[in-house]
Structure formats: structure tokens, C-alpha cells
Amino acid sequence: MGMCFGVRDAIELAHERSAAGPVTVLGDLVHNEAVLSDLRARGVLIRHDPADVPTRDVVITAHGASDRRIAGLKASGLQVFEATCPLVHRAHQALRRLVAAGFHPVVIGQADHVEVRGLTEDHPGCEVVLSEEEVDRLPERPRYGVVSQTTQPVSRVRQLVDRLAARFPASEVRWTDTVCQPTKDRQTAAEALAGRCDVVLVVGGAHSNNTRRLVDTCRSRCGRVHWLQSAADLDPAWVREGDTVGITAGTSTPDSVIDGVEAALRAMSCRSRSEARSQPPSETRAKAA
């Protein structure tokens, strides 16, 4: 439980660059307010418009960016440092290979998410879908090449790939699984955890896609699921005497925030069942505490 390696490495890079001199992160480095507040406290600037970058050094977020965007930043004289998660890089490479092989690109994910924008900007005409209805609106093409946003539930991705293949049986549909392993592991662990708890607390940033998906997964197995960003959001009314409470967290959530929620929960004198803390941050194993 806690940060995955991609998020951790991105934060370390931002810390290194801020220690070396003025630096701007183009966008939210990760979708967690505690992390962003810490970066600001270290003097890191956060800007969302490339034209508004006041420093020579600029960091690309863990969610990645298109080749076109990075080339534009370099052409404007900026020194670009990529904090892109390696598994997001892998998704970019997979999509490029599919397009080079003659497949029409399709990305399964949130169209307005920064990771998805980074995937699609280099491929004009790329389709983005996140529901069966959106798949059904796609025009028929002879060949589809499919990847997904790395934090989508793999079961949902498979469902939409199957839907695409069933809708166009004469078309060739080639799917490269780009859902990251930490997401898969955490989804599996969260589902198991939710199945044996009365209440589940999901800790993560309000704009974190992988946290949102964890909430959805937990709600499929448990009727009382609450999404909170920190211990300050914990409502005693959520927990009844004798409840077994599970804790899980998004892959951009710092251990310190999770520890704070767990401490607040224990202070409420309820039984707590949380994911094992002895596992590496990139993995999740749900066990009784």
C-alpha cells in the first residue's frame, strides 16, 4: 500500500531538480494534494500552461506527455526533465507500434485525463472510449489497435475490447495490455479486502483516477465505502461499534497520509483491517492487520 514506484521516482526527480535550482512542473506531478503542497513548500512552481513557465528547467509529470508537446517545450529553449512513469512510456511505445503496423488507434480511458491526452496527441484521429455506448458509436474500420490508460481496471478494458471485436467481426482488433501491474495488484487486493470488511476507507487525491477506480471496485463488494484525502476527512459516523474497517489507498498516496488515517481510525477504538505494510510500495497485498 502507498506510492507505486513510478510516482515515487517522479517525486524524487522533482526534489533533485528543485535542489539544483528553480524548476517548474508542467501540471500536477501526481494527483495528490499532500504531495503537491510539499513540492510548493520546496519552492517548486506548478504551471498548467506551457507559455506560463517562468524557469528554464521544466519537469514533465508522471502521467507523461506527447512527443509533440515535449518537442515544443525544447524548441522554446526549455530544459525538459521527464518524470514520466516507465509504464506510461510503455503505453506510448505500444500505441506507436500499432499505428506503425497499420492499425487505427483506440485508447480506452478518460478523454480529459492528462495521460490520455499525452497518448493521443501524436496520433490524429485516435479514438478514445470508456463505455460500451462509445464503442458502439465507432465507425467500422478494417484494423483497430487498442491500448488503455494505465490505471483503468483490466476487467473493464477486456470488456470493451471484446465489445469492439463483437461489433466488428470482420475487422482485426489487436489489443496490447498497458494496464500497469501495480494497478492490477491493488485492484485485486482491494476487491478481496472489501469482501471481508463492514466499511472500507479509500485514501487518495480527489483527482486521482486510480483512487476513483479503487472506490468503484470496493463498492462492488462492500456497501459502505468512503473516499478521503487525509485523516482530516475521517467522519466518526462512518464507523459503528464492532465494525471491521479496511484501508486501501491510491498509488499516489504518501505513506504518511495513510499512517495518519490509520492512527485516527485506531483512536476511534474500532477494529481495523488494513493491507500489510511489509510489502514494497509498488505492490498491494490485503491481509488482516
What residues fall within each predicted segment?
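The feature marks the mature, well-folded catalytic cores of soluble enzymes
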Residues: 1-289
